[in-house]
Design a protein with these regions (language model features):
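Residue-level signal for well-ordered alpha-helical scaffold segments within enzymatic catalytic domains
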Residues: 20-23, 38
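Short Lys/Arg-rich basic patches
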Residues: 1-15, 22-25, 62-72, 76-81
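Short, basic amphipathic alpha-helical segments that act as recognition/interaction helices
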Residues: 28-55, 67
Length: 81
């Protein structure tokens, strides 16, 4: 186990993306922060953060919460005024 120091941060994220992340965190019994840290650490190493069963659950959550954005949309989103 590695001992770390966490800081509180505020970030803005698309509404349905957040709903899916929160639903997934609950499903995996993780805090939202732990889930995001895990995703980022995997991405930094070029590794996939999820296996097939979790990806299936993500697909279900995307459908439930109407998340239509994909990786192709990243860094191209325009916020409503």
């Amino acid at each position: 186990m590695v001992t770390i120091e966490r800081v509180q941060t505020g970030l803005r994220i698309e509404r349905n993306t957040l709903k899916v992340l929160k639903g997934l965190a609950e499903y995996l019994d993780l805090s939202l922060g732990d889930l995001v840290e895990g995703i980022v650490l995997h991405a930094f190493e070029g590794k996939a953060p999820f296996g097939a069963p979790t990806l299936e659950k993500i697909g279900q959550l995307r459908e439930v919460y109407g998340l239509e954005l994909t990786a192709a949309d990243a860094h191209k989103l325009e916020e409503r005024p």
